[in-house]
Amino acid sequence: LDEQERSPPCRLESLMLECAPSMSHPALRAIIFDFNGVIADDETAHFIAFQEALREDGLHLTKEEYYGRYLGMDERNCLAALLADRADGPNPDREQRIHKRKASLFYAYTQRQTPPLFPGVIRLITRAMQQYRLAIASGGRREQILRALRGTSIEHAFRVLVSAEDIAIGKPDPAIYRYTLERLNARRQQAELPVRPQECVVVEDSVAGIAAGRAADMKVVGVATTYPAEHLTRAHLVLPSLEEVSLDRLEALFTERD
């Protein structure tokens, strides 16, 4: 995972992308993974850290509120929305204070116990990296994601990592997925054609993330690791976990109608 390349696509690339839909039927070429709740089993740790940081600042957050209202947002927008719901308008200083405390609490938690990767993650990504371009698009912080991957066999599987530091507007806005695809195309090898949105699969665990993936014109797989499956019905495919996800099932999405 190298430093991000922010240069806009060249005119030739834009022309190739514009012409590509007429040249072939879309087929799977890239897989973009959310991280928290999809790759790493750490949503509970994030909630506990948020809850404690807010409690120290005189605010209360229930598990039902967190999962029902705020999960899926990046940390910055989550805090802004939470304080807007509970306080008298925006308060950047308070947001920054709580954000720093939450990060400190989460770091301490993960130092004591590294959040595990979900079952099936290593198997799926090890196979997928041989055939497709892989990326992470997460509202989590880059340092936390890199720490969770460090020392695993998939640490270097992803061509691109987009995190909360890279995007001003979080999910359900599609900006994070559009930007991730732009980065993937900027890093393609010389012989590779640009990937179109219609050739991407997004793997998500949240309602907001599924909405973002669909708005980016990508296929979406919902994994019911965080929400019940019945909450994820806007995904093109809903499965209990990544253990149930195979490359054949992902490829089959491109032969089916929405």
Question: Positions of the model-derived regions?
Answer:
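Asp-based, Mg2+/Mn2+-dependent phosphohydrolase catalytic module
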Residues: 17-30, 126, 142, 146-258
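Short, acidic loop-to-helix structural element flanking the phosphoryl-transfer center
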Residues: 108-136, 142, 146
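A metal-dependent, Asp-based hydrolase signature
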Residues: 71-109, 119
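An amphipathic alpha-helix signature
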Residues: 47, 51, 75-80, 103, ...
